[in-house]
Amino acid sequence: FPAHVKLQAQVEIFLVNAAECEPMLKVDQQLMWQQAARLVRGVQYAMTATGAREGVIALKEKYRRAIDALTPLLPAGIRLHILPDVYPAGDEVLTIWLATGRRVAPAALPASVGVVVNNVQTVLNIARAVEQQFAVTRRTLTVNGAVARPLTVTVPIGMSLREVLALAGGATVDDPGFINGGPMMGGLITSLDSPVTKTTGGLLVLPGVPSVQADALAAILSEDAV
């Protein structure tokens, strides 16, 4: 859902969903401690835009480095909410309930209960846009799995996934499979020539599997799966 549309809503609570519930992805937890002050400023800008009286950053208990970096920077009106280290903590509706006590009805938007939700990278981009008039031209993502050098890297939007894979030293297995995002909710990548977009969640490299299993996995991860 576009951030500029979300920020037009007038709500009571602005929530940063920083749970990063997908295994193997490390982007949000790393950005939170590396750019803690910018994240807090981004929350303040978003609160101003939406009229929110409270800002909440919801993150998992195990992200100790991020918690330690953010805690001393929190002004009045912004707080951390510590989520359990379980899946699916990070699901938007569940996170709203855990962090605010408000329940979003089926098919309703968070704004219906007075909440706007954004992710860590979006909030950081809000701060850059306000302070430096930066457009979103880069994406930070995790490259993990069967690669020579697992890493989190910031790359230009439009860079091919093949080039991203090369930054991690390439695959370490024969006939690998590739997932855009995490292993639970990510989608199969059919071509490494596909570009990085504003919504690319990560690049996971998995060992090859027999064709029958691969077909089953493709069906599970496809948009048409029931």
PLM feature spans:
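Ferredoxin-type iron-sulfur electron-transfer modules and their immediate structural context
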Residues: 139, 161, 171-226
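Histidine-anchored nucleotide/phosphate-binding helix
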Residues: 33-49
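Active-site loop ensemble at the mouth of alpha/beta enzyme cores that anchors a bound cofactor
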Residues: 10, 87-117, 191-213, 217
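Short amphipathic alpha-helices and their capping/turn segments at secondary-structure boundaries
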Residues: 1-12
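Metallocofactor- and cofactor-centric catalytic cores in central/energy metabolism, strongly enriched
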Residues: 28-33, 58
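Short helix/loop capping segments that flank catalytic or ligand/cofactor-binding pockets
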Residues: 23-26, 91, 151, 163-165, ...
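Hydrophobic alpha-helical positions that pack around
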Residues: 3-5, 53-161, 167-172, 182-183
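Gly-rich Lys/Arg/Thr-decorated short loops/hinges at beta-loop-alpha junctions or inter-strand turns
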Residues: 14-28, 147
